[in-house]
Amino acid sequence: LLADEFCGGFALTPDETAFVRREPLVTLADVTSFCEEVPGARGVNILRRAIRLAADGAASPLEALVRHWLHVPVEHGGYGTGQSAFNVAVDVGEGFGSGMPARRTRVIDICYPRQRCGVECDGLQHESSAQSDDDAHRQTQLSNVGYREERISWKQFSSYQRACEA
């Protein structure tokens, strides 16, 4: 999980109530290169295993958490869904969906391109009615080009996490 966060493009605000976009602290290529430079160093084998589970490009803490939860093998408490990518742009063409303004691309937070499916991680900003309308339109556009998208909100995820800890 830390590798996904270090390789992500976000940082928490000082009061930890929101996040802002920023350049990643490192990339997986940087970490892999480091492991090759110090092959016998303490902890390098653990780091190598961690980066096999990680991906570059998370845009929020929720994306990093959900992708990690989905990707980690079942025997380690995850769902073992296999490799996915963060924030994949999908061409939806023009004019698909309802009469709302068309966007040529939509970005899927956690995407499985070969399976043409993904997960949209809805933070608290997705609670407004305007955002709900855009989310519904987005889902229609993706469906029209053969992508299935599931959604998970921060409230759902934190509730599930609390239930699992009980």
Report each predicted region and the residues it spans.
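Surface segments flanking catalytic/ligand-binding clefts of nucleic-acid enzymes
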Residues: R21-A166
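Nuclease-adjacent, charged terminal/linker segments that flank catalytic cores
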Residues: L1-S33
